[in-house]
Amino acid sequence: MVAKIIDGRAVAQQVRSEVAARIQARLKAGKRAPGLAVVLVGGDPASQIYVASKRKACEDVGFISLSYDLPNTVTEAALLALIDQLNADHRVNGILVQLPLPAGIDNISVLERIAPDKDVDGFHPYNVGRLCQRAPLLRPCTPRGIVTLLERYHIDTFGLNAVVVGASNIVGRPMSLELLLAGCTVTVTHRFTRDLRRHIENADLLVVAVGKASFIPGEWIKPGAVVMDVGINRLESGKVVGDVDYASAAERAAYITPVPGGVGPMTVATLIQNTLQACEDYHDTTMPEA
């Protein structure tokens, strides 16, 4: 068996094109384009790359992009004050604070300060709670992006045994909730899981997000499984690989996401979707006209 490649770049471009078309329709109707405020604290190179891609994506679809680059010496109080300002700004429909934050700033306090209806990353406890209650509003970007890939490839998830490897707040935990909504029987594995191989060998749908290059060998993959690889790992050679050994896994899986070009592009595309959703569902009545 040779797996069918799930092309995240192509689907992400479809999503962006759909959003761009809706923005043009808004502008023709006399409405203002959505606004996304992106806050970057410090000069972490990886964060700078991620933020640049998000800002460019905003501009490409016609959003108003507001940038706030703060030094790593900024105090938590000053960062919270900026978030309060953005919460009250009617031009801003979404607020994104790039993680990780420098030492001395509490991630939880910062994420909780963002108004839930502007939390386009989907990390606020209110939005995670809504997902848990089977009534999602703004959903975490990477898990929602994975669900979009499954939907666009017409992969029927009802009744599947799904295994999530990794239990982070950003991917693993919300991914498990998304898969429950999608009708799967879900197992979440983590660093204390015993006999990881046994769990993976039983997975009809496997989502891996641990940040370890080629951590899952292909021989563990159940024949005919769907493999969603969230990992992005750069080797000393400069090559970027996922958390799953791609070549060997592709010989057993029915569908697989490549790295790069699989899940990654969907994270940014979903951020764009969430920002438009926040604008249309929560802020249209308070936004000034164009």
From Swiss-Prot:
Enzymatic reactions: (6R)-5,10-methylene-5,6,7,8-tetrahydrofolate + NADP(+) = (6R)-5,10-methenyltetrahydrofolate + NADPH; (6R)-5,10-methenyltetrahydrofolate + H2O = (6R)-10-formyltetrahydrofolate + H(+)
Gene Ontology MF, one: methenyltetrahydrofolate cyclohydrolase activity
Gene3D superfamilies (alphabetical): Leucine Dehydrogenase, chain A, domain 1, NAD(P)-binding Rossmann-like Domain
Keywords tagged on the record: Amino-acid biosynthesis, Histidine biosynthesis, Hydrolase, Methionine biosynthesis, Multifunctional enzyme, NADP, One-carbon metabolism, Oxidoreductase, Purine biosynthesis
Pathway given in the UniProt record: One-carbon metabolism; tetrahydrofolate interconversion
Keyword Disulfide bond among record annotations: no
Binding site for NADP(+): 166-168, 232
Presence of keyword Transport: no
Enzyme Commission number(s): 1.5.1.5, 3.5.4.9
CDD domains, per database record: NAD_bind_m-THF_DH_Cyclohyd
Subunit (UniProt): Homodimer.
HAMAP family given in the database record: THF_DHG_CYH
The protein's name in its UniProt record: Bifunctional protein FolD
Organism: Sodalis glossinidius (strain morsitans)
Gene encoding the protein: folD
